[in-house]
Amino acid sequence: ADFAFVAFYTIVLSFTREFLMQRMIRPLAIRLGITRKAKQARFMEQFYTAIYFAIFGPFGLYVMRRSPVWYFNTDAMFEGFPHRSHEAVFKAYYLLQASYWTQQAIVLLLMLEKPRKDFKELVLHHIVTVALIWLSYRFHFTYMGIAVYITMDISDFFLATSKCLNYLDSPITGPYFGLFIGVWFYLRHYLNLHILWATLTSFRTVGPYELNWETQQYKCWISQIITFSLLFALQA
């Protein structure tokens, strides 16, 4: 059922993305004076990204606020493990995000967008992200997952909006880029390094630490290595 949910919303997001880009964002780009097709395409991609994260950034904070891991409480990520049941809004948020990242990975791998200079790095980033999403959901590390989602979503919103301003040659591009750098450092590095440190420490000491397939207890040395490696790869 969960797989079907993700598959369905991957398709829904694909159509939503195309509809918004062609019917709303392209006319907006033309109205704002972006005439070159290549620049229009980049603006459309970033504007859609900004719209998505403008919704899911606050949504993620709302869901986190209702959970024990507010505000990036790393010990709560491991207390009472495994976390096998969640309220509906948590599960919906998690799986909708899985749909978004799956859809983005498909766009990238099928080269539906013109490849950027950092194409290989972007592909690797998406592979790591999708692996983290599916493994965290399958093995009940969703409290860690929501924290990583939020750090990525909000920082990506500022990245996308910064790029949009740059395409528009906006006079506030410079100051806004400075704000983006601050947000990016705090979310992608400070908070994620905090989570990485917890993976090395609290992961072992807080809550059970053993492998037991019958009780779905997967917080053990194997998952610790895999989790740390994937999270570290996002920092690279």
In which residue ranges do the predicted regions lie?
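Membrane-helix and juxtamembrane interface regions of eukaryotic multi-pass membrane proteins
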Residues: A1-Y143, K163-W184, Y190-F232, A236
